[in-house]
């Protein structure tokens, strides 16, 4: 009998947990070179937004993003689908509509059969079709580990762009997916995942964040991002620092995937959690070990974090309900604290 290939055994990292830590990334992106100024580039990398946005000058803007990583699941088709869903999410997180995807593939051709890569790309193509776009091309290289993702192009009405820098004090914070993806996938890699929890993380990662396009039509949605490799706290800090605000997170309102707390107790915490906390732990209040494991857990293809003004809360809740999204409140934004603490966890 042919032995089943487990893709996660061919990579040192998994999904968005492969991300370089925020601290190290800051060093990499620092440059002494004079910045090139383009007045039409209305969102660049200054505010850690999910994608770049270029104003065409006719009321429409182009959104451009890329995202790729190593396998977080063993099944090739699911890996391709998750990676593509995650990449497309950046367009939705800016409030836009995707129009085209380009594949990015790295594959160890001397280790794994080409048929595995074919299934990975097919998974990506399936996700693109779900989003209503074509997988229009791509580029591939021979690499030591499997890598897959997309470069995605989208469009948006220029005035509807949701930036990290546009959040307002007093906004309530909502999430569209439960946390714990990194914990469940780590439990699976360690062989500790119970049968009743099989597929939970994959289902969450394959849920398309297309609701972001609808949220962007609500003026009271002041900022939006997808929660991925830096965890909920890391991406919330990006919004706070971009908008010169602070935040409070209500730990008792955080929703997690089934079994997450039991797996934390068994030590199924991904390495990315510690790297995340090392990068921004000094910016958050005191956390229990369980809170740290959940709030710093690197999500792959995680949910949207949405900042909503009070007069638009019901509208956003209704949009989510109509779309079958289990929206839940996680905190609120407040004026910038005088201390170094950006996010307080209660």
From Swiss-Prot:
GO terms for molecular function: ATP binding; magnesium ion binding; selenide, water dikinase activity. Its cofactor is Mg(2+). The active site is at residue 16. GO terms for biological process: selenocysteine biosynthetic process. Mg(2+) binds at residues 50, 90, 226. Binds 1 Mg(2+) ion per monomer. One of its GO terms (cellular component) is cytoplasm. Its EC number is 2.7.9.3. It catalyses: hydrogenselenide + ATP + H2O = selenophosphate + AMP + phosphate + 2 H(+). ATP binds at residues 19, 47-49, 67, 90, 138-140. PANTHER family: INACTIVE SELENIDE, WATER DIKINASE-LIKE PROTEIN-RELATED (PTHR10256:SF0), SELENIDE, WATER DIKINASE (PTHR10256). Synthesizes selenophosphate from selenide and ATP. Homodimer. HAMAP family: SelD (MF_00625). This is Selenide, water dikinase. The lineage of its organism: Bacteria, Pseudomonadati, Pseudomonadota, Gammaproteobacteria, Pasteurellales. The gene is selD.
């Amino acid at each position: 009998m042919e032995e089943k290939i487990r893709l996660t055994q061919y990579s040192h990292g998994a999904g968005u947990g492969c991300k370089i830590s925020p601290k190290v990334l800051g060093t990499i992106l620092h440059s002494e070179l004079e910045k090139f100024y383009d007045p039409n580039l209305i969102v660049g990398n200054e505010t850690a937004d999910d994608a770049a946005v270029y104003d065409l000058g006719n009321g429409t803007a182009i959104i451009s993003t890329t995202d790729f990583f190593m396998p977080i699941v063993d099944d090739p088709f699911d890996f391709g689908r998750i990676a593509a869903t995650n990449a497309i999410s950046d367009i939705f997180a800016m409030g836009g509509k995707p129009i085209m995807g380009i594949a990015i593939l790295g594959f160890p051709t001397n280790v794994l059969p080409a048929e595995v890569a074919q299934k990975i790309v097919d998974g990506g193509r399936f996700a693109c079709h779900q989003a209503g776009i074509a997988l229009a091309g791509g580029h591939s290289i021979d690499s030591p580990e499997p890598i897959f993702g997309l470069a995605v192009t989208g469009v948006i009405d220029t005035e509807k762009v949701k930036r990290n820098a546009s959040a307002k004090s007093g906004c309530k914070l909502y999430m569209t997916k439960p946390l714990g993806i990194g914990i469940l996938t780590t439990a699976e890699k360690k062989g500790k995942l119970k049968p009743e929890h099989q597929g939970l993380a994959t289902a969450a990662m394959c849920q398309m964040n297309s609701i972001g396009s609808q949220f962007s039509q609500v003026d009271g949605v002041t900022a939006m991002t997808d929660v991925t490799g830096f965890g909920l706290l890391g991406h919330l800090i990006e919004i706070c620092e971009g908008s010169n605000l602070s935040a409070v997170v209500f730990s008792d309102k955080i929703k997690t995937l089934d079994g997450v707390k039991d797996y934390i107790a068994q030590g199924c915490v991904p390495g990315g959690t510690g790297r995340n906390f090392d990068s921004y732990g000094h910016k958050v209040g005191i956390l229990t070990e369980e809170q740290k494991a959940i709030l710093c857990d690197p999500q792959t293809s995680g949910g949207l974090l949405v900042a909503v003004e009070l007069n638009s809360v019901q509208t956003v809740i209704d949009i989510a309900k109509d779309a079958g999204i289990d929206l839940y409140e996680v905190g609120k934004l407040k004026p910038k604290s005088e201390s170094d603490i950006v996010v307080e966890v209660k």
